[in-house]
Structures are given as C-alpha cells and as structure tokens.
C-alpha cells in the first residue's frame, strides 16, 4: 500500500480524533496569522475597484476539524479588511479544500456551518479537492492563493534505508536519531528535496500571475536534523515499539523496516529547494518557535501523546496493527511522564514559514 493511502489524520470526533487533538496546529496558525494576512492582502492592488471578482484559494493537506476552518476565517477576514481599506466591492471567495482521498471530508464539511454562521454577509464557497499535492491538482492559472499548514513536510514515500544486502540501517528507530548512520540522514534529506521540489513545480502552473503561496512546515532551528526538539517524540515512540517487540506483540522485522514518511527541514534547506526549483520569488521566510513545556498545556503527558497520536496513528496502525495502538500510546505516555519528572522532554515546536510569489513568464513542460 502506498503512503498516499495511509497518510491522513484520525477520523471522526472521538477521543483520539484530530478534531479533538489539533490544539498545537491551531497555535501555529495563530502565531503565523500576520504572514498569511499580508500574503492575502498583497493580491489586491491599490485601486478603488476590486482587481478580482472571484478569489480562488487552495488549502493543501487541509485535514479536518478546526484547522481548515480557522485558515478559511483568516483569509475571509483579510479580504474583508483590505476591501474596506480600498473601498472596493468584495469578491466572491472559492475555497478548494485539498487532501488525500483517505481524509475525513464528511467531518470537514459538517464543520463548515461554523464558518457559514460567522460570515453570513460574505459570498464564499467551498469544495473538496482530493488528490496528492506531489502532483497536479488544479487547472492552469486558476489559483490566486495556495495555503498549507503542517502538510508539505509529509513525504510521498518513506526513504529506502537499507544496506546493499537489504538489511535495515536504522534498526530500532522510526526516524533519524543521534545514533543513525549518515546514510539515513542523507536519504531523508534527498527524499524531502525531491518531494518539496515537486510541490513547487506542480503549483507554479496552477497559480494565476502574481499569485501567492504560503507554506508552513514543521521544521527545525539547527543544522542538525537529529536535534532533540525534532526527534524526541519519535525516539520515544521507537522505545515504546521496542517494548512491544520485547512483549511479543510486534514482530521485530516490522519495526526494523519502518521509517516515518515525514521530514523536518531547516529554513536553509527549504530556501535552497525554492531557489533551485526556480518558479517562485521568496517574499518572506522565517523560523517560528512555540514553547510547549513548562506550564503550557502541552506539558501534560496525556495531552502531548494524544496530540501526536491524532496524526501518526493511521501510519503506525497500518504497519503494526490497529490492535496494539492503545498499548503503544499508553506505553509512550508512561515513558513521557517519567521523562517529565527528570526534565528530559523536548520543550519547543519549530515552524518554517515562507511566502512565495509566482514568477512571471514561466514556461512549463
């Protein structure tokens, strides 16, 4: 089964659903709101007539629950504010909510009533756009704004990390760690560069002239891809999985062959791919830090693990079996609680934010 068939957030609105556990992503959206507002408002020129009758907005990897609803609200309010400033007529707004086919679009669409009630006097529309952002999604020159929060760091496939003899090089781990050989780090970076370049290349023909793209990725601050704030929870999950192996609940070979299809880039790595791909000019680029330790709600081990479970469980359950998920995350919470007592836990969440403008006179093949 391909990654595109198993990467989605936990469905529904139950205890472990993404709807109930996406608090961290909402904090990221709030922190990066000014950048999104500026990108939206840059679509309007300083005239007294609206340059656009319809604004087409794509949300890549929108997921479900409060995250896409909050992003939609920010876009609507930014356009309302700019049109009020210019004294121009409000355009209609068409949202294209994109995610893989496994996404719970039913729950997503049920939540739209919140936005409908909030913006009764704004003419806006929403439609689903299932598909992979690693390929084409929309017609040429059709999108004015492409937005993505915490999606494009997902890889199209897990990097192949084996020796020439076919043996796992990252045994006992599910991501890079301090003990991983250089080949593991190189494989992850290479896969990210290939996939992120595809995201840019396929969006370029889809954006209208002077269109903007705002991408928010879960990243890292340092040049070291195994820094603690990035790898901590994945190392913790690997430890919990190893415990289940020792209990005979998981086959050791399954753990040895598993690597998460996810990469946390640095700002420099993101900018390097953008420059090399060549379709966009970078208008803004920054690293945003959120403190998640101390007295923050995320210092509660149970909440922290639920926050991780809501987006990682589908991939993990496909590899190891749905029947062990409760035991896995219970063990992870137990390890995390002990680390909290000893002050070992990671305390920061890092985001990379870029605002890109489509270059003119592009030629596509």
Curated annotation (Swiss-Prot):
One Gene Ontology biological process: methylation
MF-aspect GO terms: metal ion binding; S-adenosylmethionine-dependent methyltransferase activity
Co-factor binding details: Binds 1 Mg(2+) ion per subunit.
Functional description taken from the UniProt entry: Involved in the biosynthesis of theobromine.
Protein name: Probable 7-methylxanthine methyltransferase 3
The UniProt record lists the keyword Transferase: yes
Family indicated by similarity: Belongs to the methyltransferase superfamily. Type-7 methyltransferase family.
Domain of life of the native organism: Eukaryota
Source organism of this protein record: Theobroma cacao (Cacao)
Reactions listed under catalytic activity: 7-methylxanthine + S-adenosyl-L-methionine = theobromine + S-adenosyl-L-homocysteine + H(+)
EC numbers: 2.1.1.159
Chain positions recorded as S-adenosyl-L-homocysteine binding sites: 18, 62, 67, 99-100, 132-133
Positions contributing to theobromine binding: 25, 150, 153-154, 311
Keyword annotations: Magnesium, Metal-binding, Methyltransferase, Transferase
Binding site for Mg(2+): 170, 258-259
PANTHER family according to UniProt: S-ADENOSYL-L-METHIONINE:CARBOXYL METHYLTRANSFERASE FAMILY PROTEIN
Cofactor: Mg(2+)
Site residues (Involved in substrate discrimination), renumbered to this chain: 147, 218, 262, 322
Gene3D superfamilies per record: Methyltransferase, alpha-helical capping domain, Vaccinia Virus protein VP39
Group of enzyme by EC: transferase
Pathway, per record: Alkaloid biosynthesis
InterPro entries according to UniProt: MeTrfase_7 (IPR005299), MeTrfase_capping (IPR042086), SAM-dependent_MTases_sf (IPR029063)
């Amino acid at each position: 089964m391909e990654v595109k068939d198993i990467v989605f957030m936990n469905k529904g609105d139950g205890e472990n659903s993404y709807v109930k556990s996406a608090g961290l992503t909402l904090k990221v959206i709030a922190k990066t709101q000014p950048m999104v507002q500026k990108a939206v408002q840059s679509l309007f020129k300083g005239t007294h007539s609206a340059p656009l009758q319809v604004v087409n907005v794509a949300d890549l990897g929108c997921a479900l629950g409060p995250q896409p609803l909050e992003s939609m609200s920010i876009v609507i309010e930014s356009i309302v504010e700019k049109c009020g400033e210019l004294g121009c007529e409000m355009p209609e707004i068409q949202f294209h909510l994109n995610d893989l086919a496994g996404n719970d679009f039913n729950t997503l669409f049920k939540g739209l009533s919140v936005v409908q009630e909030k913006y009764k006097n704004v003419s806006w529309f929403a439609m689903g756009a299932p598909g992979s952002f690693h390929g084409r999604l929309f017609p040429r020159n059709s999108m004015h704004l492409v937005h993505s929060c915490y999606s494009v760091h997902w890889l199209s496939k897990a990097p192949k990390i084996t020796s020439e003899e076919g043996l796992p090089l990252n045994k006992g781990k599910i991501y890079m760690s301090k003990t991983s050989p250089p080949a593991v780090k190189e494989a992850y970076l290479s896969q990210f560069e290939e996939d992120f370049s595809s995201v840019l290349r396929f969006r370029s023909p889809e954006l209208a002239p002077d269109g903007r793209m705002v991408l928010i990725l879960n990243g890292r601050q340092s040049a070291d891809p195994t820094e603690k704030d990035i790898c901590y929870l994945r190392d913790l999950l690997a430890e919990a999985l190893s415990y289940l192996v020792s209990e005979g609940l998981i086959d050791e070979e399954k753990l040895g062959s598993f690597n998460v299809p996810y990469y946390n880039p640095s700002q420099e790595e993101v900018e390097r791919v953008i420059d090399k791909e060549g379709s966009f000019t970078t208008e803004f680029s920054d690293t945003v830090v959120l403190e998640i330790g101390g007295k923050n709600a995320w210092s509660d081990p149970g909440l922290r693990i639920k926050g991780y479970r809501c987006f990682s469980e589908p991939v993990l359950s496909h590899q190891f079996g749905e029947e062990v998920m409760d035991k896995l995350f219970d063990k992870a919470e137990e390890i995390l609680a002990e680390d909290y007592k000893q002050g070992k836990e990671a305390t920061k969440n890092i985001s990379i934010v870029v605002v890109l403008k489509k270059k003119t006179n592009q030629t596509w093949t």
